[in-house]
């Protein structure tokens, strides 16, 4: 450890620590604009200037001592940027003297010279770092210890301010105000270093310098993070622009349930309306980043909500009270035998809801219990790796597309190939200026092998990569096990896997939907003692499996017919609904299939409004907290399942969240997550074959509202030769019918799609399956 004296305090920090982080560790403050967690420190803004001294040394190399027996300090002639200066043993740092304060105040004034006075209308007002630094470090007498400085408290700039483009949309989600930009370069460094999409840069020189792109748009699935890290109001979220002031919004820390990563998010609401989603720092999971689908795809939560129960009368659904809905439940279920009832939970159902459904299924003795998006092979088949395990690994073998299936894994793999290690944790948390991060760090492409059914974005960082046909995962894994000869790339991956001392295996839906491939993947990991990250289509797959939400030997799965009476926390495929005597749906939005088949539809909260817990792909238990969003009479699945139990004549073991918490603690659920295991012989393999491959996507179909409509639009990918044979011109709008529903999609020609296959996106939890289907023109005729 290195001993550093900051003002009057001595701290010990690891070698390589920046002076800035040593100052924070000592409990003092230093202003900053350009430094940001997880980005390279560059010393661009010069706000973090401090005075640095080192012990004088004699000819013998030993420190010279003063009269008090203390090392004599030689101060550097100029102030230094603390973010790019490393600590040294015996260093003395001064952050409080007038010379330091004067320099910091001068940098504040310099930054404000051309900054517009937009604070009354700027969305960053109240959360602006420039506002805060101006108040804290600007030209104010009270911040100087030796009396007032002889400096004016007004600007000395006597010329016309610079005026540039103020309203420049970079994409449908992000707008740039170039007048407010202070050239800290956070956004440019972010794209270069974190997702690896170099789409922003400085253009022109000198006073004419501005941030821009070569073309309209930010071709990255992680562009929204620049709105969080921008220190001023230069980059803003268009979904929330001009809708509320920062101090008017209520902040709710919760967890995103769109994918199995479980990123920390903050839901900002006002007057019952969800206005904005921001990343919440969870160092072990998403650090300070989230994907664009998680950030911008929230407008559906406020639009066209189902707010009252609906009961079928005279062939159509009509609004009803909860009392009337309960009576309809009792009437519709009065002849139901327990084993005829199916309980099917949504993919983002909480642990508490899963436990109640499991207990209720036991009481009813029904085998029909499942959750939306459950894969043929359970995630709990594999020992879970943590995201920090990935950074400590020496090789990653990926079968799937993390960018679409678990987006934050894309960012973690970016860190992994740059050889970054988890940073040291200080008193103030993650370092603000981590000196191990450099601009334009080379990426070690030999550390990753990636196989996917199309050209995945991460292939640019994998020296070993290959595009394969859907369903060939089992053959690739057989070759990796050494039981079959594979392609040249598979042979290279096998060699790298065998040489690795601490590898991690990452599996996508294509493997998890195939029990043979999954068993081979388990064997591959077991032989090497490797841990696995399983990218399930369901957000809480590990948690619901732990609660026993799985079909019995004769039970029908979530997408199959079977149970005569059924509760659904989602909209299942139409085939699963046919022939049902009584259907209860618990939905946040009314769906055409619910209007056609449901006998009772009950209003449900979205995951933004839920209280409970999820388990992510690491096996980590994560909290959900309810944001105050207007949802009418919506009730959670705990209350609805309890009502269903009473209608069936069964006493529910609990109905309140606190009671569910006690039941979870009694079962020691969090501690048991890592020990849960399955063997595939206990589960029925599913064979699905067809020309349509349901491609996993970051954006989900339900997000296709508001500004997310274009990003979440479904696409039908086809090889150009296949497209010509099927008469599918580039850009055509077609309708596609599959067992999982009808989707309007845009035709996209791609050379990396195998001939004879059609890839369809935006069907969410059905990802990774091969199914039969047909393409129709919008009018209904066959294409």
Swiss-Prot record:
Q: What class of enzyme is it?
A: translocase
All disulfide bonds of the chain are none
State the family named in the UniProt similarity comment for this chain: Belongs to the complex I 75 kDa subunit family.
**What Gene3D superfamilies does this protein map onto?**
2.40.40.20, 3.10.20.740, 3.30.70.20, 3.40.50.740, ADC-like domains
What PROSITE patterns does this protein's entry cite? 2FE2S_FER_2, 4FE4S_HC3, 4FE4S_MOW_BIS_MGD, COMPLEX1_75K_1, COMPLEX1_75K_2, COMPLEX1_75K_3
User: Which residues does [2Fe-2S] cluster bind?
Assistant: 34, 45, 48, 83
Q: Per its UniProt entry, which superkingdom is the organism in?
A: Bacteria
Q: Which cofactor does it need?
A: [2Fe-2S] cluster; [4Fe-4S] cluster
> NCBIfam families from the entry?
NuoG
- Name of this protein: NADH-quinone oxidoreductase subunit 3
Role summary = NDH-1 shuttles electrons from NADH, via FMN and iron-sulfur (Fe-S) centers, to quinones in the respiratory chain. The immediate electron acceptor for the enzyme in this species is menaquinone. Couples the redox reaction to proton translocation (for every two electrons transferred, four hydrogen ions are translocated across the cytoplasmic membrane), and thus conserves the redox energy in a proton gradient required for the synthesis of ATP.
Its UniProt domain note says:
The subunit comprises two main parts, an N-terminal [FeFe]-hydrogenase-like domain (residues 1 to 240) that coordinates clusters 1, 2 and 3, and a domain similar to molybdopterin-containing enzymes (residues 241 to 767) whose first subdomain coordinates cluster 4.
Give the originating organism: Thermus thermophilus (strain ATCC 27634 / DSM 579 / HB8)
The entry lists its GO molecular-function terms as: 2 iron, 2 sulfur cluster binding; 4 iron, 4 sulfur cluster binding; metal ion binding; molybdopterin cofactor binding; NADH dehydrogenase (ubiquinone) activity; quinone binding
Q: What membrane topology was assigned to this protein in its record?
A: Peripheral membrane protein
Which cellular component terms (GO) are annotated to the entry? plasma membrane
Its recorded reaction(s) are: a quinone + NADH + 5 H(+)(in) = a quinol + NAD(+) + 4 H(+)(out)
Which residues are recorded as binding [4Fe-4S] cluster 3?
256, 259, 263, 291
- Predominant location category: membrane
């Amino acid at each position: 450890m290195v001993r550093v004296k900051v003002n009057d305090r001595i701290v010990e920090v690891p070698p390589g620590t920046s002076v800035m982080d040593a100052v924070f560790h000592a409990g003092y403050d230093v202003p900053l604009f350009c430094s940001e967690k997880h980005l390279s420190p560059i010393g661009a803004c010069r706000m973090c200037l401090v005075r640095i001294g080192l012990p004088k040394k004699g000819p013998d190399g030993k420190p010279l001592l003063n009269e008090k027996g203390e090392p004599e300090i030689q101060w550097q002639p100029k102030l230094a940027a603390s973010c790019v200066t490393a600590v040294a043993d015996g260093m003395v740092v001064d952050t409080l003297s007038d010379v330091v304060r004067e320099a910091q105040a001068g940098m504040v004034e310099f930054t404000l010279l051309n900054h517009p006075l937009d604070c009354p209308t700027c969305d960053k007002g109240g959360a602006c770092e420039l506002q805060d630094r101006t108040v804290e470090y600007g030209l104010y007498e009270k911040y100087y210890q030796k009396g007032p400085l002889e400096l004016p408290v007004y600007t000395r700039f006597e010329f016309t301010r610079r005026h540039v483009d103020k309203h420049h949309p970079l994409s449908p989600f992000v707008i740039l105000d170039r007048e407010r930009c202070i050239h800290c370069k956070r956004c440019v460094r972010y794209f270069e270093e974190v997702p690896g999409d170099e789409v922003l840069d400085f253009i022109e020189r000198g006073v004419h310098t501005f941030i821009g792109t070569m073309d309209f748009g930010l071709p990255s699935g992680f562009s929204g993070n620049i709105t969080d890290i921008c220190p001023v109001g230069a980059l803003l979220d268009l979904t929330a622009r001009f809708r509320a002031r920062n101090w008017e919004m209520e902040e709710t820390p919760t967890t995103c349930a769109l994918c199995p990563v479980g990123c920390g998010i903050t839901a900002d609401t006002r007057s019952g309306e969800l206005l904005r989603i921001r990343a919440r720092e969870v160092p072990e999971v998403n650090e300070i980043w989230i994907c664009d689908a998680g950030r911008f795809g929230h407008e559906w939560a406020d639009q066209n909500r189902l707010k009252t129960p609906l009961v079928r009368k005279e062939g159509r659904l009509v609004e009803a009270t909860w009392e009337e809905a309960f009576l309809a439940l009792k009437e519709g279920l009065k002849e139901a035998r327990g084993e005829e009832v199916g309980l099917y939970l949504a993919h983002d159902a909480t642990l508490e809801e899963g436990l109640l459904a499991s207990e209720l299924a036991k009481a009813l003795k029904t085998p029909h219990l499942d959750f939306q998006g459950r894969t043929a092979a359970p995630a709990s088949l594999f020992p879970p790796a943590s995201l920090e395990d990935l950074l400590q690994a020496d090789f990653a073998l990926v079968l799937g597309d993390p960018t679409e299936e678990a987006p934050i894994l894309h960012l973690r793999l970016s860190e992994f190939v740059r050889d970054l290690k988890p940073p040291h944790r200080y008193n103030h948390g993650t370092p603000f200026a981590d000196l191990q991060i450099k601009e334009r760090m080379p990426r070690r492409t030999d550390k990753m092998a990636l196989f996917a059914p199309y050209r995945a974005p991460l292939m640019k960082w994998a020296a070993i990569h290959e595009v394969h046909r859907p369903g060939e995962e089992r053959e690739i894994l057989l070759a990796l096990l050494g039981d079959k000869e594979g392609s040249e790339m598979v042979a290279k991956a096998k060699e790298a896997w065998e040489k690795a001392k601490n590898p991690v295996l990452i599996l996508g839906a294509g493997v998890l939907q195939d029990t043979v491939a999954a068993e081979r993947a388990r064997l591959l990991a077991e032989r090497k003692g490797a841990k696995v990250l399983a990218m399930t289509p369901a957000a809480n797959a590990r948690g619901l499996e732990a609660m026993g939400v799985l079909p019995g030997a004769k039970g029908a799965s979530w997408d199959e017919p079977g149970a005569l009476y059924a509760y659904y926390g989602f909209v299942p495929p139409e085939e699963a609904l046919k022939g049902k005597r009584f259907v209860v749906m618990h939905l946040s939005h009314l769906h055409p299939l619910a209007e056609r088949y449901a006998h009772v539809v009950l209003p449900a909260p979205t995951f933004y409004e839920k209280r409970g817990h999820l388990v992510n792909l690491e096996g980590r238990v994560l909290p959900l907290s309810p944001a105050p969003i207007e949802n009418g009479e919506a009730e959670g699945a705990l209350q609805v399942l309890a009502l269903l139990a009473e209608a069936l004549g069964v006493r529910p073991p609990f109905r309140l969240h606190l009671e569910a918490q006690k039941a979870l603690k009694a079962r020691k659920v969090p501690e048991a997550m890592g020990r849960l295991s399955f063997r595939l012989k206990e589960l029925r393999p599913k064979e699905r074959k067809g020309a349509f491959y349901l491609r996993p996507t970051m954006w989900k179909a339900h997000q296709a509202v508001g500004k997310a409509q274009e990003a979440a639009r479904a696409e039908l990918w086809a090889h150009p030769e296949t497209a010509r044979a099927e008469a599918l011109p580039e850009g055509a709008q077609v309708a596609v019918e599959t067992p999982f529903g009808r989707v309007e999609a845009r035709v996209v020609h791609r050379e990396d799609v195998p001939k004879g296959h059609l890839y369809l996106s935006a069907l969410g939890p059905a990802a990774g399956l091969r199914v039969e289907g047909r393409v129709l023109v919008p009018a209904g005729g066959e294409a």
